[in-house]
């Protein structure tokens, strides 16, 4: 039996990236202040409306609510999914014969979620379910949100992998018994997941075959021409 049978994955800055245009309505630092405000957090929890959020944040940061709306719309328009990572997760799921379930867990308001769902190149069918902060009434790193997702999906924490780009969110997941991975870049995440789900023996054998004739010893990036490692590999594999 595989050690893990579920993945809880963040959406923004993991499966989706955004890049505001150079002539963005609000400077990037100002936009980040909007998105990290306590009022915005209440909006993501579904406790206030979109217009109420824009009005309050505008007063708090001395910004026009109209400019906030335009900046959010521009950011949503720039959203792109990491199709390579999505395809990788699809292949990983298929390789388990359906035993692996994949869920999304995102801090997001309902209007922004609706905008996210309109991104055309995303394969939403990869998810068995999607958990949002506006539906849960809580947001990461609040433990209430994790417990909500675990209960709704009937997940065993020790058999669930949690992926997020924010360390504080991963630490909260780990406190609930999940195996947390901090997302930094797609290639690293793929390698981590292969290590967790793949057969290490098969992976090692595949590496030997793919690199046959090039299995030299390396030290500090320098190839060392010696025979011991070659003879050891030959003895263990009986394969030239």
Residue ranges and their predicted role:
Residues 41-73, 228:
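A metal-dependent, Asp-based hydrolase signature
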Residues 14-15, 20-22, 107-111, 136-138, ...:
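Short, solvent-exposed loop/turn segments at secondary-structure junctions
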Residues 2-37, 41:
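Active-site neighborhood of HAD-like aspartate-dependent phosphohydrolases
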Residues 10-13, 46, 104, 130, ...:
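Generic structural signal for small/hydrophobic residues in well-ordered secondary structure
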Residues 1-9, 199-211, 215-220, 227-228:
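Non-catalytic pre-domain segments flanking phosphatase-related domains
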Residues 110-160:
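Substrate-recognition "cap/lid" segment bordering the active-site pocket of phosphatases
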Residues 69-103, 143:
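Short, acidic loop-to-helix structural element flanking the phosphoryl-transfer center
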Residues 145, 165-178:
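Acidic, divalent-metal-coordinating active-site segment for phosphoryl/phosphodiester hydrolysis
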